[in-house]
């Protein structure tokens, strides 16, 4: 890590004035880098982390999950269907353009056309420009999650992204896993500008001199994001001083990090559910509820949480973690090998069958090891698994094609709400609305769809919770998916890199506010 006194600091010291701010140059090692620079191409942790660095949302969560004003200074409800947002004035994009309501409306419309994000904004009718610095978000019906959804509106530079590129293609086009102007060009309002990017090698960021948030104490002027897939290699880079911060820290490495001089380990409980989906379209056996139940009973997820995750995870029996509106304390993990064998026999598969499985090897903590363990467990009920693991850059295109019989996916609820988990993972797939966008199990239950639709217009918290709990019970009984665990979070950093105030349960550290002291 390099520390350098800013020109302002030098000038102040030359004038005999005290100034303790230092400009930091740090390197952060993650398990993988963002797959694209288009903030709407993929709904993933890597994309959202990039968004919080290069863009700003209208509002964001603080560490207590309270809403914090960002590009919207304030907001108020106009009527049951309308929330009004008052925008900050004088906010500049990296291009030099000034942010206005036009950019917010343009971004909202683009989100509604994004295959990955449209489901979040399906309850909305439109965004309306009231004046240059006022925008109304209008929902189709009463909707209780407007502010939660607004955390996903990162205003884009509409002038920068409008028109044609050198190949005659629309600059605003969203191309999944392909080449587009937005996937390689970026202009936001955030604390950092992307100055260089080599996919799979590094992304270089430089602090935006005209950043609007002058109250931020962040003093990182240069940041390099470096992907290091292997857990042990990532830790070694931190301990040797090659990098200044790493994420995640695998459970096996916690003691190494905690025991190192000048290094801190910061942990938080997590709400990201890790699951396997069972593709009913690719393997006829998985259409039988008894087979799906047998698979759930055969996978010892409590053992995975204890041994592979070293206790740094909570075994799950449902989608919703404790504290979410749909969480049902009665839906517990249910490993029972004998029960699994009985169900296989009852379904006519006593001798088992074969299936394919895919999983990433650098997206979730110990993802490949978990997949290998699950495959071994399924062999005990006669299911022969052909497992393939791959880096996430190759994994997501395969997942989007639902290219296996069982597929690993983790999900952190975008709105910190139970309904979001179902909307993306277990509702009936609908390309028009975006519902079920990541439902490669092709599970479809009209009652689940109906309950979620009703929950999205229910403003009574108790009634809404009852609807969401009923959804979890149906998914549990149908064995709609294989719940594994809720993944906890861990970061490691040099002690003078103060990450505790910027990390959060969403797993999007607010690097713009990061303070680094001189050693």
Spans of features found by a protein language model:
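Alpha-helical secondary-structure segments
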Residues: 101-107, 132-138, 190-191, 219-222, ...
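Short helix-initiation/N-cap motifs at beta->coil->alpha
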Residues: 132, 187, 225-236, 248-252, ...
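Aromatic- and charge-enriched surface segment that lines or borders ligand/interaction sites
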Residues: 73-117, 130, 136-138, 237, ...
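Ligand-site clamp/hinge motif
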Residues: 210-256, 384
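Short, solvent-exposed loop/beta-turn-alpha elements that line the ligand-binding surface or hinge
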Residues: 46-77, 153-189, 211-219, 256-268, ...
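Detector for C-terminal structural segments
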Residues: 26, 198-202, 207, 274, ...
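Short, well-ordered beta-strand elements
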Residues: 24-35, 73, 82-85, 104-107, ...
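Surface-exposed binding/hinge segments that line
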Residues: 76, 119-170
């Amino acid at each position: 890590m390099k520390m350098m006194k800013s020109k302002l600091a030098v000038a102040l010291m030359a004038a005999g004035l005290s100034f303790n701010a230092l400009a930091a140059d740090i390197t952060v090692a993650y398990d993988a880098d963002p797959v694209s620079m288009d903030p709407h191409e993929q709904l993933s942790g890597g994309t959202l982390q990039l968004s919080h660095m290069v863009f700003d949302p209208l509002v964001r969560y603080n560490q207590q999950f309270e809403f914090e004003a960002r590009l919207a200074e304030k907001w108020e409800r106009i009527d049951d269907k309308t929330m009004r947002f008052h925008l900050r004035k004088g906010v500049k994009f990296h291009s030099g353009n000034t942010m206005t309501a036009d950019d917010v409306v343009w971004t909202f419309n683009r989100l509604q056309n994004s295959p990955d994000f449209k489901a979040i904004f399906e309850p909305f009718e439109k965004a309306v420009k009231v004046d240059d610095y006022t925008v109304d978000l209008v929902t189709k019906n009463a909707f209780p999650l407007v502010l939660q959804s607004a955390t996903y509106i990162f205003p884009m530079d509409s002038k920068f992204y409008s028109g044609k590129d050198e190949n005659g293609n629309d600059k605003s086009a969203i191309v999944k896993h392909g080449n587009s102007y937005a996937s390689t060009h970026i202009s936001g309002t955030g604390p950092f500008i992307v100055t260089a990017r080599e996919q799979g090698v590094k992304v270089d960021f430089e602090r935006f001199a005209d950043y609007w948030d002058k109250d931020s104490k962040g003093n990182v002027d240069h940041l390099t994001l470096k992907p290091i897939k292997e857990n042990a290699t990532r830790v070694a880079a931190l301990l040797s001083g090659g990098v200044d911060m790493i994420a995640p820290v695998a459970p096996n490495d916690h003691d190494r990090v905690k025991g190192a001089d000048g290094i801190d380990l910061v942990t938080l409980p997590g709400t990201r559910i890790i699951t396997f989906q069972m593709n009913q379209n690719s393997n006829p056996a998985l259409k039988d509820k008894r087979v799906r139940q047998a698979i759930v009973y055969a996978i010892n997820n409590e053992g995975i949480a204890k041994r592979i995750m070293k206790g740094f995870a909570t075994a799950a029996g449902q989608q919703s973690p404790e504290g979410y509106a749909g969480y049902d304390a009665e839906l517990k993990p249910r490993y029972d090998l004998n029960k699994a064998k009985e169900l296989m026999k009852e379904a006519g598969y006593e001798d088992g069958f074969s299936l394919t499985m895919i999983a990433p090897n650098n997206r979730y903590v110990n993802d490949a090891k978990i997949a290998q363990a699950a495959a071994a467990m399924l062999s005990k009920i006669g299911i022969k698994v052909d497992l393939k693991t791959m880096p996430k850059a190759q994994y997501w295109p395969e997942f989007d094609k639902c290219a296996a019989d069982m597929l690993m996916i983790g999900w952190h609820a975008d709105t910190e709400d139970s309904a979001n988990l179902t909307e993306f993972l277990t509702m009936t797939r609908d390309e028009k609305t975006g519902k079920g966008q990541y439902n490669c199990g092709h599970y479809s239950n009209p009652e689940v769809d109906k309950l979620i639709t009703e929950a999205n217009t229910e403003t009574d918290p108790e009634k809404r919770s009852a609807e969401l709990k009923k959804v979890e019970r149906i998914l549990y009984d149908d064995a709609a998916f294989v719940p594994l665990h809720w993944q906890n979070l861990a970061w490691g950093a040099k002690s003078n890199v103060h990450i505790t105030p910027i990390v959060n349960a969403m797993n999007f550290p607010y690097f713009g506010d990061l303070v680094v002291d001189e050693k």
